[in-house]
């Protein structure tokens, strides 16, 4: 079999061996030589001795249709692991009969033991010839085409030579791979196919100054400071503060819709319009006020402002206030219960006269009252089932039980005092019953003089602060703070709002009797305790401030009344000092 394989003659055993080899390597084309019995050993570098690998069997030398062109394989009889080694230029063979030693490209040393020494010499000679031919091809193929010609098999491609050549060319070109600097040559400037970069934002200043490598064409972003940012928005809060009032003053005819939006729970209390944005009032608006209003807002020695927090008061509808049995609500001048309030100084009376002018100013409250009636007159006919907040005149009802005899005498003394029932008008045009300013001031002066001439100077009448911005009534702080000692003796006071209608002699309450002609402008006590009562939320300081500011800016008549009251108080003070 070995002779037949060596001579290249066809045989049945040769075909079986070739088929078995092609199962492991399909590129094997033919068998060149065969050794019947060999064993493979490896040299151990640590032990410095030969070690058996467990591979022994028949050795086949063959040619391949692909690179590498030659190789040998030991078909192992002991196991399924065969030993295959390609024949390349890196192999180094040495004959030591009956051993054939060789070293491969990984510098591993192996020894093949041959059972037949003649086979050992023949295979050793063949291995050396094939290795030398591979080395010659590698030397000549480095400068020639990677395509090589095999003996008698046509034109084939050497993959290893192609990879080697590509590596060499890459190594040579790596030294000069850096691009050269572009110059202003004519070849570059005149080339139409050359794509030149175009600046994104060219500026004329950069063209004149020349290219600056450290600066970009994009402008630097502007950094806004907090001063510049808030300086531009100083006027915005002022405009936003005035807008809600003008909007509701323009649409005051749609008061039913505003009632549903502003007072979802309490039907007798109208929420303030300025409570939506109470903090939008800026400081420059306060600086534009006249001295009289600043004195009124900051609090003069005679003025006692109400608490700014409405939570300090009892505001449940239909129940009297716990402090002395007093219900919050505006108090008209000349009330028979004025004798129960504490003593006030002359400056206090002058300050309250200013506030009474605020109440009597036409069109001063309706702009902030979405719940006011839309009729053309001040006192219009209102259905009994409507909201009590729509009424325009406030009365104090009589006591629940007969008072003490001492207090009855007090009532007789105070009942003789003249009074003026000042109604809060809806607008300037729809208030024909509002008294002129001079007549109102004259009557206020008469009331004040008669109160000073009363036999009980220690209990002079004090006019509490009352304002109805946004359709709400303020409670009486002075009565709560000054009448703690008289709570057990004083009867409960009830503030009721009765709708009015016009008569020939003046105003008449719908639910009571018609007022006499001589006393149509006096405040009368009502005996109907079962009528509906309203406890409203007081205005905060910011809400009152916004209401006054809006009236000063938009209503000239309001400002004129305040100024006349201010002049009158100054002249009265000068007369008293002289």
UniProtKB/Swiss-Prot annotation:
Q: Which GO terms describe its cellular component?
A: nucleus; P-body
Q: Which reaction is recorded as catalysed by this protein?
A: a 5'-end (N(7)-methyl 5'-triphosphoguanosine)-ribonucleoside in mRNA + H2O = N(7)-methyl-GDP + a 5'-end phospho-ribonucleoside in mRNA + 2 H(+)
**SUPFAM superfamilies (UniProt xref):** PH domain-like (SSF50729)
Q: Phosphothreonine-modified residues are where?
A: 380
Ordered alphabetically, the record's keywords are: Acetylation, Cytoplasm, Hydrolase, Nonsense-mediated mRNA decay, Nucleus, Phosphoprotein
Matching entries from PANTHER family are given as: MRNA-DECAPPING ENZYME 1B, TRANSCRIPTION FACTOR SMIF DECAPPING ENZYME DCP1
Instruction: Describe the protein's quaternary organization and the partners it interacts with.
Output: Interacts with DCP1A.
What name is this protein filed under?
A: mRNA-decapping enzyme 1B
